[in-house]
Amino acid sequence: MCSVPRGNGVWAALRAFWAALTSYRADLRYPLFWQGLESLFTSETKAWKVTERLCTRLSFFLADNAQTQQDLFDKANICYDTRSKIIHGRWQPGTEINQPMADTEATVRTVVRHLLERPGMIGAFVSPKRDDFLDAWVQSKAFTPPPFTP
């Protein structure tokens, strides 16, 4: 992790994840986890359909088949909706945060594990070509990453 260069989505994500992990209150932790996921999976230049793009990219990154991809997309959409409620002041404290928090924490753990374990993933995600790489992955509808040329 010390080898991750600064000034890219991976660095921003790691900082957000660290801030989330060292926070206690759910309404502060939860958006930080999603800030990190947004740093990894949203576009730096395309500001339209952010939720759809985030959920699609995230679900293809994590899935190994079509059913899992759809399930992960749906779960990410629900969790991102919770993030939006918190950010926009519509969230009410209570136990309904427990499941989205558990799902989000599991997603973050799995994303970080895949970034570290899959050969070339850190390189692809710190690259200025990350957006093209993720678009190619989603367009391929494959459950393995496309070739990446730095």
Question: Where in this protein do the model-derived segments appear?
Answer:
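Amphipathic, oligomerization/interface secondary-structure segments
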Residues: 1-150
